[in-house]
Design a protein with these regions (language model features):
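Hydrophobic "anchor" residues
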Residues: 39-40, 107, 124, 131
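Per-ARNT-Sim (PAS) sensory domains and their PAS-associated C-terminal
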Residues: 72, 76, 85-115, 123-125
Length: 142
């Protein structure tokens, strides 16, 4: 089979609906942050972890960590994100933080994973990744 035909078959198999199903099965949320514009998009699972909904404007955790990230984790989080974006790494970013649900006093442990897309000058222009709720694991560890 020609390579182009295989590629088109894979594109039909891996539809956005199926990818969303896989993320739901893994209990993971997906985000896309356009670093140039500052605009961030979250899947419903990310919004649920944050205690937000589609009806309200959810904060960008990368530019406004003080709104959702535990105060003891904010500096660490911002530092690790900056280090990753400045480092030109091909290794995915992985940061474990405590995230507060908006309008609530409840906290969850979340692992924020991401990969940067870079321009021709190797500057980060986009960060794409998933959030994983790791509260059960962290509770067992503590």
């Amino acid at each position: 089979m020609p390579p182009s035909r295989n590629r088109h078959s894979a594109q039909r198999v891996f539809t956005w609906d199926k990818i969303k199903m896989a993320l739901a099965a893994a209990e993971e949320g997906f985000y896309i942050w356009n670093i140039k514009t500052g605009v961030i998009h979250y899947t419903d699972r990310c919004l649920t972890m944050m205690g937000a909904s589609r009806k309200e404007k959810a904060p960008n955790i990368f530019t406004q960590p003080e709104l959702t990230i535990h105060e003891e984790d904010q500096a660490f989080f911002s530092q690790e994100v900056r280090r990753y974006l400045d480092g030109h790494s091909h290794v995915p970013m992985r940061i474990e933080i405590r995230m507060k649900k908006l309008n609530s006093k409840s906290w969850s442990w979340v692992r924020v994973n991401g990969l940067a897309r870079r321009d021709k000058q190797r500057r980060p222009v986009m960060l794409v990744g998933v959030w994983v709720n790791i509260t059960r694991r962290k509770t067992a560890e503590l």
